[in-house]
Amino acid sequence: MVLTGCGAAPAAQGGFVGGDGSLTIVAPDQRTTAPQITGELLGGGTFDSATLSGQVVVYNVWGSWCAPCRKEAPALEAAARRTAGRATFVGLNTRDLDQAPAQAFVRAFDITYPSVFDPDGRELLKFGTDLPPSAIPSTLVVDAQGRIAARVLGEVTEATLVGLVDDVAAGK
């Protein structure tokens, strides 16, 4: 079961489970294979994570309705730019029932990396129970061997994300 939510503030507690900012780093010999993520991209086109084989991939789970997602969006875009060439960023937009609000979010925050449109959470469920993105926002870092190396539940900072990408790209 994947529990999703938005924020930890009392105003955001209307039945959602928010992230607490916890960071889980998985030792290379303990990592499990990330699922193959496929789907329609916001704005058109399709995505298949198999095309990113051999690359460090950062997945960020977000929703246009999520206040912590709006707060972290500039940090994610900055980290994506700073780590270009070392990691590929992919958004996983969830629980937006149509693309219009999600596309408005992408435009408002000048997000340059692609996002998979996953309104029913089908792609999120592929992560299973080992290290699921069980809050919104959540961020997962996948190593070049296709294994989940790190997870952040809740907002992530630019510094934390750049550090994670650098470590994972270095084989740590």
Regions found by a protein language model. Name each.
Residues 20, 46, 99, 120-124, ...:
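Structural motif corresponding to alpha-helix initiation and N-cap regions
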Residues 35, 57, 136-137:
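Short loop/turn microsegments at loop-to-beta-strand junctions
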Residues 46-70, 76, 89:
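Short active-site neighborhood of thiol/selenol oxidoreductases, capturing the structured segment around
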Residues 70-109, 119-126:
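Structural microenvironment flanking redox-active thiols in thiol-disulfide oxidoreductases
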Residues 104-112, 119-172:
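Thiol/disulfide oxidoreductase modules built on the thioredoxin-like
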